[in-house]
Amino acid sequence: MDFFSTHNILIHIPIGAGGYDLSWIEAVGTIAGLLCIWLASLEKISNYFFGLVNVTLFAIIFFQIQLYASLLLQLFFFAANIYGWYAWSRQTKDNQAELKIRWLPLPKAMAWLAICVIAIGLMTRYIDPVFAVLTRVAVAIMQMLGLQVTMPVLQPDAFPFWDSCMMVLSIVAMILMTRKYVENWLLWVIINVISVVIFALQGVYAMSLEYLILTFIAVNGSRLWINSARERGSRALSR
């Protein structure tokens, strides 16, 4: 059976109601995601290779299960991984990494906070129509490319506020990571904790366990990057 098919099951995980069928593509994509976050916590540029594998495979998964809005968001994360790889690779004349781990200056931190609050508020109010528009855009693009896809039936979001938080904070965290700002890890901790709870409430315990592992990696990443920023003389909320 095709490796890229979500019906090619690697293992049945006997947890939750009815268990969870883990496909090969999801397993490889998940492992790539875990490696990406772990290597990023160690400030290794190679994290972006695994990040690209992760978003590519999950884009394929989202295509198969008709989550076209989520597929479209993977294009952003793909581009962000490409940019992050480039930004982290840049060197000074002394062959040192041009970007250093540091905290956001207070004005930038406040600006990002305002952006997050406003974006989460708007998304919470309009998440269903926003995802409907994103889905229509994705379907139109795929149809122009010759793919035989139709507009899926969309269900109202069960957790509009929390899903909005995860989407907005994930985008902001990815942007901050490409610029090596410590705050990206604090956001990932928040995102992962929310994900653990949401998936547990939905009975998808395998995904909840995955995000629990990601939470521990993000907490360790926060510790490592805070120490690294301190060694370079960078302080949180400094002007």
Swiss-Prot record:
InterPro entries per UniProt: NMN_transpt_PnuC
In this record, what's one Pfam family? NMN_transporter
Q: Cytoplasm among the record's keywords?
A: no
Q: Periplasmic side of the membrane: what ranges?
A: 43-48, 90-109, 178-183
Compartments in which it is found: Cell inner membrane
Q: Where are the transmembrane segments?
A: 22-42, 49-68, 72-89, 110-127, 158-177, 184-206
- Give the Gene Ontology MF terms in alphabetical order: nicotinamide riboside transmembrane transporter activity
Any one GO cellular component localisation term in the record? plasma membrane
What functional role does this protein have? Required for nicotinamide riboside transport across the inner membrane.
Q: What is this protein called?
A: Nicotinamide riboside transporter PnuC
